[in-house]
Curated annotation (Swiss-Prot):
Gene from which this protein is expressed: rps10
Species whose genome carries this gene: Trieres chinensis (Marine centric diatom)
UniProt keywords, alphabetically: Chloroplast, Plastid, Ribonucleoprotein, Ribosomal protein
GO molecular function: structural constituent of ribosome; tRNA binding
Pfam family, one: Ribosomal_S10
GO annotation, cellular component aspect: chloroplast; ribonucleoprotein complex; ribosome
Subcellular locations according to the entry: Plastid, Chloroplast
Signal peptide: none
Summary of the function given for this chain in its UniProt record: Involved in the binding of tRNA to the ribosomes.
HAMAP family xrefs: Ribosomal_uS10 (MF_00508)
SMART domains per record: Ribosomal_S10
UniProt name for this protein: Small ribosomal subunit protein uS10c
Family label: Belongs to the universal ribosomal protein uS10 family.
Subunit structure: Part of the 30S ribosomal subunit.
Amino acid sequence: MEIKTNAKIRVRLESFNHELLTSACRKISDTIQNSDATKLSVVSLPTDKRIYCVLRSPHVDKDSREHFELRVHKRVIEIYYDPTVKCRIISKFRITVRSIISY
């Protein structure tokens, strides 16, 4: 008799475009649900917002400035699965697998 244990994969996705990130999460969740994974959860992380201040004039006029903003949207997908089943993960985006936890 074979004893099955559950394992967990945590996948972190980052993107500057939140619509692209949402579609990537949807594609990954559709792929995982078609396989034999037992549970899937998508968690939204706080958005990093960086503001850069640039002087417009090269010499004087410090009052004249421009502000640029860069936002990084993040999601974490946790996949609970049976270790004997191999899951396919879409690799079109920047994906980092932080940890594989087996319990």
